[in-house]
Amino acid sequence: AASDVYKRQMNDVLLPAKKGGYGVGFFNAVNVEMARAIIETAEELRAPVMVGTAEILLPAMELARVAEYLIPMAEKASVPVCVHYDHGLTFEKCMQALELGFTSIMYDCSTASYEENIEKVAEMVKICHAMGRTVEGELGHVGDNAGAGKLENPSDYFTDPETAADFVKRTGVDSLAVAVGNAHGDYAFPPKLDFERIRVIAEKTGIPLVLHGGSGLSDTDFKTAVKEGVAKVNIFTDIDKAGKRGIEAGLAAGEKSMMGLIPYEIDAMKEVVRDKILLFGSNGKA
């Protein structure tokens, strides 16, 4: 059913963010508690927000199940909530997400060769744009932290601004995930972001940029990245760990049931979402 959620496109939240110099948080929600923490906090702060899941997170909750709670919650929200499928690695799963009603797709072909990345992403853009949906691509490679700090020349994996301009022109993507010293998961070494690179990529591509591996970066890192052209910041590890801390707090307080633990879990996650939204500056923008 074509409903209001289809109007809540990635571009509807990211283009004003890019123009207004603030960032929009994208938070993965692998269960209803996470979804509630994200959406309720966004409503309280009057902030546009993006929610979804990633292919790598599907063991926690399969795509069709995620769609069952997430899309209706997004539709009923009093602020714009864009439902996004993150790090789609296979064409089939991306298609399933579109079929289920996700309004934007990140098709991650960043480990493929440059030409293959362009070819695959351009095809996804063609499909999504025909359906009135949006696409995020990735250029350069945002790895995980297991090996990130140990690379001989980490900048070999960084996004090149000239190449980024070519990639955007040839694929037609709506937003671009960049590799600028960021990595997924917990940082083994303090990350050093290349802000000048972000600024040049933003200038040359003209589209909203996306920062993956946001958990573990400093407040200053986020603020500067947003100032230089990042419009979407992905957060999962921080909110995931907060949920666990909330449960531990509930157990320590003597809670004896799953039901009793839920408010603790939600409150702990809401605190992280709140901090991030205020940090990115998207509060009051909805």
Task: Place the predicted regions along the sequence by residue.
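Short, small-residue-biased leader/transition segments that mark boundaries at the very start
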Residues: A1-Y6
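N-terminal amphipathic alpha-helix/helix-capping segment at the start of soluble metabolic enzymes
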Residues: K7-F26
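Short gly/pro/ser/thr-enriched loop/turn and capping motifs at secondary-structure boundaries
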Residues: L57-P59, A112-Y114, I239-K244
